Amino acid sequence: MHPFASYVLRSYYKATGWNEDNLYANLTRSSNAILDFTVPRGLHLTVSKSPNALFKTTYSMTAMPSLHGSVGYIFTSCDLDVKSSGNVRFKNMIERFKVYDQPRRPEPKEEEWLAGEQVQKRDYLLYGRFYLPTGRLDALYSTRLSPTVQALVAAISDPPSNIPSELRDRNGDPSNIMLNLQHDVGKWCTEYTWSAEDGMWGVRVLHNFGRLGMSDAVEDGGGGKGDRTVKVKRVDEEDAVEGGLKGRVSMGAELYFSAKERSAGVSTGIRFTTLPDATPPSFQVPSSSSSSSNPVSPSTSQPPTTITALFNPMLGHMSGAYTARVSRDLALSSRFDFNVYSYESEWTMGAEWWLRRSLTPRPSEDGEIHPPTPPPFPPPVEDVQGVVKARASTNNDVSLMWEGRLRNMLVSLGVVSDFSSRSKPIKAIGLEVSYFSSE
């Protein structure tokens, strides 16, 4: 489940028109959602509030195994349509398998005029979080320098403390500041990174083959207007060929080095993904005359599929993953990792199963069972009420997690087990409850 701060950050990217998916760091995002999901540890509670469209607050507390908490504040320069935990789209709060929309060049903001003069307004986001009792402080500043360039500054301040080590965050990082510059033109996306702690410089590049998408591309699961999709040939669409999968290919690489640590690293990756969740191919879109008599479902052409491969020549690590949605509510993923130097390997399998409300007919007053009458318009409330994720690997690690909505709260419950240990088969179990309001 996404933390409230991550949900606000994604809403900020969406409001400013920035495509966070067109990054080399997110090349394996679809398979990671199923194979690398994070199971909560202990008891974790989060309460957040949006007093207005620009300012947000969030409070979190972990009661088990140790007691600690944090306070966070978020401020944005633009209005964000942040929902409450009771009415937010459930899939927007879950890291899930998804065929992401085709990349496109970011568009500039609309011009604003005041008293006959153009107002130069730059979007930005400020985020800060203070942890208790460790005294650690996290900060993030994100701003758009131009329609295609975004800058991020992240800082961590972790002062020395006399607090016992068991009360401190296990993943705590020393004080550091990192600069990140992203340049996205749709077909290419480049990242430049600098870290002050170890003096590390890095660059990442992602190239998308084929033509760019349209600016009015339809989101996953969303419906666009008919006049925008009927008889429109998608720009990256190829001619119909029997057999095989149709989609797009993306390739990328990263290079980083540190003069202070006298170390360097390099990796490369490739991704193939189909496009059934975006604008359907033109031959699958029914015309205005035949749409009512012979509708065609775009999802029946090919299953949503993502295939990725990564290679790190310096560490000798190779990884290949295959992820596909085999039905409306079930997605499966498999990944094989291999090291060419040590010959160590690992095979990981995972599944994602969505739970929906049952629409069973109810008996009427006369005792007869009548089928439910479909409403004249689609209901505004989605029928998804939860998701179950499972993961197993050849290292005998098995993880199971359920995420759902109970009344106005988002709940995550998970367990991690190790079948190779008879003395302690359950490694971790946790419960996370999140509530946030925008009223």
Swiss-Prot record:
Component of the ERMES/MDM complex, which serves as a molecular tether to connect the endoplasmic reticulum and mitochondria. Components of this complex are involved in the control of mitochondrial shape and protein biogenesis and may function in phospholipid exchange. MDM10 is involved in the late assembly steps of the general translocase of the mitochondrial outer membrane (TOM complex). Functions in the TOM40-specific route of the assembly of outer membrane beta-barrel proteins, including the association of TOM40 with the receptor TOM22 and small TOM proteins. The lineage of its organism: Eukaryota, Fungi, Dikarya, Basidiomycota, Agaricomycotina. It is found in: Mitochondrion outer membrane. Pfam families: MDM10. The gene is MDM10. One of its GO terms (biological process) is establishment of mitochondrion localization. Residues 275-305 are annotated as: Disordered. This is Mitochondrial distribution and morphology protein 10. Lacks alpha-helical transmembrane segments, suggesting that it resides in the membrane via beta-sheet conformations similar to those predicted for other outer membrane proteins and porin. It is a multi-pass membrane protein. Component of the ER-mitochondria encounter structure (ERMES) or MDM complex, composed of MMM1, MDM10, MDM12 and MDM34. Associates with the mitochondrial outer membrane sorting assembly machinery SAM(core) complex. Belongs to the MDM10 family. Residues 280-305 have a biased composition (Low complexity). One of its GO terms (cellular component) is SAM complex. Keywords: Membrane, Mitochondrion, Mitochondrion outer membrane, Transmembrane, Transmembrane beta strand.
